[in-house]
Amino acid sequence: MYINTILFDLDGTLIDTAPDLSYALNTLLEEAGLEAKSFEKIKPLVAFGGKALIKFGFNYDEEHPEFFKRHQELLEIYTNNIDLNSKPFEGVIALIKILKDRQINWGIVTNKPEYLTHLLLQKLNINVDVVVCGDTLEFS
């Protein structure tokens, strides 16, 4: 069987974004006068997106009157610090080169918003054949 395309998740698979997402959440918590959370507790949640981080950090559900505002603030902090410590996992750049050399298309399917995905890939100088994000399609 010949494989001509491979799709990957982004956060926690290709790119270690946990440090910058953790930084964004803890910055927001500290600005709100709350105690920062440990990286070890935040790290498993990053794959579930910013809303999961707000639920964890503030103990809010999505019906809380400040949930949307806090989520937007988190995204703003993250946007401004998206490449502070995020980096490809070991071997990812070599893997991308192998795929290109073998003329295998590759892409990303992620729950991360499109504007953040493209910004992160640009900052890390990663060129990809196709990207499908959490807000790319009508249903995610």
Walk through the language-model features, giving the residues of each.
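N-terminal helical cap/lid subdomain that shapes the substrate entry/recognition surface
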Residues: Y2-I93, R102, P113-Y115
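Substrate-recognition element of Asp-dependent hydrolases with the DxDx(T/V) motif
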Residues: L25, L95-Q122, G134
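Hydrophobic "anchor" residues on beta-strands that sit immediately upstream
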Residues: T5-L7, G107, V130
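Substrate-recognition "cap/lid" segment bordering the active-site pocket of phosphatases
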Residues: L84-K87, P113-S140
